[in-house]
C-alpha cells in the first residue's frame, strides 16, 4: 500500500449532462475568436518606409464611438466598492472554477489564470512551427513574462504530450529585485524567477525594461546562441486602476516595443502572441495592420479563462514572413523605440486600406458586444441575484470546468517534469509580498479622492497613524536573531553586477513595500527629498519622541548574554578574553555596568552621520564607507570576537550582500533600533557575536568590490555596483526574514519622526488660527 495517498480529484460529469441553454452559454464562452481573412487582391501591403512617422495621430470616428460607449458602461462601476465588486464578479465568472480544478487534477506548476489562458491558446492554434519538431529543437522568447505562467504552461504542454524536441527558453520582465523599479508596475511573484534566474534577461541596465534600444540590442546578443526563435510571447500591461478608461493609450508605447522586439527576434515561419486590450485607437489599428502585413495569419482570441468583463484579448500571429521582408521599415521603426513614441503616427490614414478598416471594425464590434453584455449583466446581478440565478451560475461554472478538460485534453504531469522540481530557495519575495499589491478596500472614486489629498491632509486625517502607533510598541532585536551556519562560500562563482546609478530606492525584496512607499512619500512630500538638519528637522527643545531609545548599557547587556551562550556551547573558550570592536563610535557614554569584554573603538564619524534620503542605503558613497569599515574591522577580529556595527538600512542588494557575508562569519547577528534620538540619522546597530573567520578568497573578493566602488566614485562614473552576491543566495529564508525585520524597524522609526513632527506643526497652526 502506498504510504502517501493523493487527495482524490472530484469526478466530473460529462458536459452533455447539462441543459441545452447551459451548454449554449459555455460554447459561446469558448468561441471568442476573430480571424482577419485577407483579401484575394493582396492589397494589405506595408507602405514605403518614407511614409512612416510623417503624419499626426488622427482617430477614426467609428472606433471612438465604440470606445465612448464602452466607457459609459464602465463609468457605472466607479462607485462600487472594489472588494465587493471583485467578490461579486469572481462568483459570476463562468470560468471561475477552472483554475483550481486544473491545479489539482493535472498537477500544474504555477497554475494561475495566465497558465490556463496560455494553455487555451496552445491548444487552439498551431503555435509551434513544424520545423521545430522536424529539427528536434524548439526555442521560445517570453517578454513581460512575470511570474512565468506562460513558460510553465508551455512546459506542461510539451512534457505531457511528449513532443519530440529539446526546448530552450529565455524570458524577460521588469526585474523584481531592482531598487529603482516601481513595485506597482511589477508582478512581485518570483517563485519561478528566483529558481531560474539564468534564463531571465534584465537588460544592460538590469531593470528589465524592454522600452529602450539598448535592451533590444542586448537581448539579440543574449539569444544569439539560438539558431532561430520559433515562438515569441508578450504579456505586458500596466496597472491602469487610476485611469481605466484610457488603458489602451497608456499601454500603447509598451505594445509598440513588444511588437518591434518580436519582429526583430522571431525566425521565419515563427509565431507571436501579444496581449492587447481594446483596439479602437489609431496606434492600435496601425499595429494590427503591421502584424497582418508581416504574418500570414492573425487571430484575435479571448480565452474562456480571461475574465469576460475586461478588455483583454490575445493577438495570435502565425507564420512570420521574416525580417528580410520588412527590413527597411523595421530599421526605421527601431529608431522610434522607447517609452515616448514619436508624436507622429506609424502609418498615415491613407495607406491603410478600407478593406482592412472594415475587417478591424468587425473585430472590435465582436469583442465590444461581449464585454458590454458581461458588464451589464454583472451590474444587474450585483443589485439583485435570486436563488435561481445563483443555481444557474453554479451550473455554468461546473459545465465550464467539464468543457475545458474535455476540449483541451489536459494530462497529469509529475513534479519531476516541472521547471522547478524542488525550490532551492526557502523563501522568496512572493510569500512576503502576498496580498500587498492590490488592496481593494476603496471604490475608484474614493481612491481618486485620496490621490487628490495633500501629504499634510493625509497626516491630519490620520492615514499613517498605524505606523507611528505600531512603532511605539515595537521591540525589534529581541526576537530577530540570525544564527550563522558553517557554509562553503563559493565566491569563485559570484560576479559583480554594475548598472546605472540609482536615482532613488523605490523597491526592495528585503522590505515591506507599503512601508518603503510610505516612507518615500513622507521624505518627498514633507522634506522635499532632502534634509536640512540645521533648520527644519533639528528637534525643538520640547520635542520628544514617544518611542523608546535603546541605551548603550542595554545593548552591551544583550551582547554579553549572547557571548555567554557561546561559551556555554563551548564555541568560545571561557579563558580567552573576547574582544568587542565598536565601529563608528568615538567614545562610550553612560556605561556603568562591568563589561567582561576588551572593548576597542574603530572610529568612523561619517558612518553614523549619514541621513535617511530617497536613496537610503543606495548611495554609493555610503556603501563604500560601510564596506571600507567592514574590511578594516574584519582584519582586527579573531575567533569568538564580537562587533557592534551601525547601519543606515539594508534595502539594496549591495547591503543585503554585506549582511550575508556577516551572517556567514558570525555565530549570531541581531540588531537594536532605535539607538539614537537624532532625527533621520543612522538609528540601528548590528550586534555580531562569535566571529568564525572569513575565508581569504571571500576577503579578497570584497576588496575587489571595494576597489571598484572607489574607482567608480573617483571617476564620477554614471554606474554603480548593484550586486555582488547572487540573488539566489540572498533570498534564503532566515536571512530574508531578518532583513525584513531590520528594515521595518528602521523605516518605521523614520516615519514616526516625520509624522509626529508634521502633527506638531499642524496642531501649532490650528492653535494660531
UniProtKB/Swiss-Prot annotation:
Enzyme class: transferase
One Pfam family this sequence matches: FtsJ
Catalysed reaction, written as an equation: a 5'-end (N(7)-methyl 5'-triphosphoguanosine)-(2'-O-methyl-ribonucleoside)-(ribonucleotide) in mRNA + S-adenosyl-L-methionine = a 5'-end (N(7)-methyl 5'-triphosphoguanosine)-(2'-O-methyl-ribonucleoside)-(2'-O-methyl-ribonucleotide) in mRNA + S-adenosyl-L-homocysteine + H(+)
Binding site residues for S-adenosyl-L-methionine: 148, 167, 235
An annotated GO cellular component: nucleus
Protein's UniProt keywords contain Methyltransferase: yes
Record's subcellular location: Nucleus; Cytoplasm
Entry keywords, A to Z: Cytoplasm, Methyltransferase, mRNA capping, mRNA processing, Nucleus, S-adenosyl-L-methionine, Transferase
Record-level Gene Ontology MF annotations: mRNA (nucleoside-2'-O-)-methyltransferase activity
A GO biological process held by the record: methylation
Active site: 117, 235, 275
Domain Adrift-type SAM-dependent 2'-O-MTase: 109-322
EC numbers on record: 2.1.1.296
Superkingdom, taxonomy of origin: Eukaryota
Primary role: S-adenosyl-L-methionine-dependent methyltransferase that mediates mRNA cap2 2'-O-ribose methylation to the 5'-cap structure of mRNAs. Methylates the ribose of the second nucleotide of a m(7)GpppG-capped mRNA and small nuclear RNA (snRNA) (cap0) to produce m(7)GpppRmpNm (cap2). Recognizes a guanosine cap on RNA independently of its N(7) methylation status. Display cap2 methylation on both cap0 and cap1. Displays a preference for cap1 RNAs.
Protein name as annotated: Cap-specific mRNA (nucleoside-2'-O-)-methyltransferase 2
Organism, as annotated: Pongo abelii
Gene: CMTR2
Amino acid at each position: 500500500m502506498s504510504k502517501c495517498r493523493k487527495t482524490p480529484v472530484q469526478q466530473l460529469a460529462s458536459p452533455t449532462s447539462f441543459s441545452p441553454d447551459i451548454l449554449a452559454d459555455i460554447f459561446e464562452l469558448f468561441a471568442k475568436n476573430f480571424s482577419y481573412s485577407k483579401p484575394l487582391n493582396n492589397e494589405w501591403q506595408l507602405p514605403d518606409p518614407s511614409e512612416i512617422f510623417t503624419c499626426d495621430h488622427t482617430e477614426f470616428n467609428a472606433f471612438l464611438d465604440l470606445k465612448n460607449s464602452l466607457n459609459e458602461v464602465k463609468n457605472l462601476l466607479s462607485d462600487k466598492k472594489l472588494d465587493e465588486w471583485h467578490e461579486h464578479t469572481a462568483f459570476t465568472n463562468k470560468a471561475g472554477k477552472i483554475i483550481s480544478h486544473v491545479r489539482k487534477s493535472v498537477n500544474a506548476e504555477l497554475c494561475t489564470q495566465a497558465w490556463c489562458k496560455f494553455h487555451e491558446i496552445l491548444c487552439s492554434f498551431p503555435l509551434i512551427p513544424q520545423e521545430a519538431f522536424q529539427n528536434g529543437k524548439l526555442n521560445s522568447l517570453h517578454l513581460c513574462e512575470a511570474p512565468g505562467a506562460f513558460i510553465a504552461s508551455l512546459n506542461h504542454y510539451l512534457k505531457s504530450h511528449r513532443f519530440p524536441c529539446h526546448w530552450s527558453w529565455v524570458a524577460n520582465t521588469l526585474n523584481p529585485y531592482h531598487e529603482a523599479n516601481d513595485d506597482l508596475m511589477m508582478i512581485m511573484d518570483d517563485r519561478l524567477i528566483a529558481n531560474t534566474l539564468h534564463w531571465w534577461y534584465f537588460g544592460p541596465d538590469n531593470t528589465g525594461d524592454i522600452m529602450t534600444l539598448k535592451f533590444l540590442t542586448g537581448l539579440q546578443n543574449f539569444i544569439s546562441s539560438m539558431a532561430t526563435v520559433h515562438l515569441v510571447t508578450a504579456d505586458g500591461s500596466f496597472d491602469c486602476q487610476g485611469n481605466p478608461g484610457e488603458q489602451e493609450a497608456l499601454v500603447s508605447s509598451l505594445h509598440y516595443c513588444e511588437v518591434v522586439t518580436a519582429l526583430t527576434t522571431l525566425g521565419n515561419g515563427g509565431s507571436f502572441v501579444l496581449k492587447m486590450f481594446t483596439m479602437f485607437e489609431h496606434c492600435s489599428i496601425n499595429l494590427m495592420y503591421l502584424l497582418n502585413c508581416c504574418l500570414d495569419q492573425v487571430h484575435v482570441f479571448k480565452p474562456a479563462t480571461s475574465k469576460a468583463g475586461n478588455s483583454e484579448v490575445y493577438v495570435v500571429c502565425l507564420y512570420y514572413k521574416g525580417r528580410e521582408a520588412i527590413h527597411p521599415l523595421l530599421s526605421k521603426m527601431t529608431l522610434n523605440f522607447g517609452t515616448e513614441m514619436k508624436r507622429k503616427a506609424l502609418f498615415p490614414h491613407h495607406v491603410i486600406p478600407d478593406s482592412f478598416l472594415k475587417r478591424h471594425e468587425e473585430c472590435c464590434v465582436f469583442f465590444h458586444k461581449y464585454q458590454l453584455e458581461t458588464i451589464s449583466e454583472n451590474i444587474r446581478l450585483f443589485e439583485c441575484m435570486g436563488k435561481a440565478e445563483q443555481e444557474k451560475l453554479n451550473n455554468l461554472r461546473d459545465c465550464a470546468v467539464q468543457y475545458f478538460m474535455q476540449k483541451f485534453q489536459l494530462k497529469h504531469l509529475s513534479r519531476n517534469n516541472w521547471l522547478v522540481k524542488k525550490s532551492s530557495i526557502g523563501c522568496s519575495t512572493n510569500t512576503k509580498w502576498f496580498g500587498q499589491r492590490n488592496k481593494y478596500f476603496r471604490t475608484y472614486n474614493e481612491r481618486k479622492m485620496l490621490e487628490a489629498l495633500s501629504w499634510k491632509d493625509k497626516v491630519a486625517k490620520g492615514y499613517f497613524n498605524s505606523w507611528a502607533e505600531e512603532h511605539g510598541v515595537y521591540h525589534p532585536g529581541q526576537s530577530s536573531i540570525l544564527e550563522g551556519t558553517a557554509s562553503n562560500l563559493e565566491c569563485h562563482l559570484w560576479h559583480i553586477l554594475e548598472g546605472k546609478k540609482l536615482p532613488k530606492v523605490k523597491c526592495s525584496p528585503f522590505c515591506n513595500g507599503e512601508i518603503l512607499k510610505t516612507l518615500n512619500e513622507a521624505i518627498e512630500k514633507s522634506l522635499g527629498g532632502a534634509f536640512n538638519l540645521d533648520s527644519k528637522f533639528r528637534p525643538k527643545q520640547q520635542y520628544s519622541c514617544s518611542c523608546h531609545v535603546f541605551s548603550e548599557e542595554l545593548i552591551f547587556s544583550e551582547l554579553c548574554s549572547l557571548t555567554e551562550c557561546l561559551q556555554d556551547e563551548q564555541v568560545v573558550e571561557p579563558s580567552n578574553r573576547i574582544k568587542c570592536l565598536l565601529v563608528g563610535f568615538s567614545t562610550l557614554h553612560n556605561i556603568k555596568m562591568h563589561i567582561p569584554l576588551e572593548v576597542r573603538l574603530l572610529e568612523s564619524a561619517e558612518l553614523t552621520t549619514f541621513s535617511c534620503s530617497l536613496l537610503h542605503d543606495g548611495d554609493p558613497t555610503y556603501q563604500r564607507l560601510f564596506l571600507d569599515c567592514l574590511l578594516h574591522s574584519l582584519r582586527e577580529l579573531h575567533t569568538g570576537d564580537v562587533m557592534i556595527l551601525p547601519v543606515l538600512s539594508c534595502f539594496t542588494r549591495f547591503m543585503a550582500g554585506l549582511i550575508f557575508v556577516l551572517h556567514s562569519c558570525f555565530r549570531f547577528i541581531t540588531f537594536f533600533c532605535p539607538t539614537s534620538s537624532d532625527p533621520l540619522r543612522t538609528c540601528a546597530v548590528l550586534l555580531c557575536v562569535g566571529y568564525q573567520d572569513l575565508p581569504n578568497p571571500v576577503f579578497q573578493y570584497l576588496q575587489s568590490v571595494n576597489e571598484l566602488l572607489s574607482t567608480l566614485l573617483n571617476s564620477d562614473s554614471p554606474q554603480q555596483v548593484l550586486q555582488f552576491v547572487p540573488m539566489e543566495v540572498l533570498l534564503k529564508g532566515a536571512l530574508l526574514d531578518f532583513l525584513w525585520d531590520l528594515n521595518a524597524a528602521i523605516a518605521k522609526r523614520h516615519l514616526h519622526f516625520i509624522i509626529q513632527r508634521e502633527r506638531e506643526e499642524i496642531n501649532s497652526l490650528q492653535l494660531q488660527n
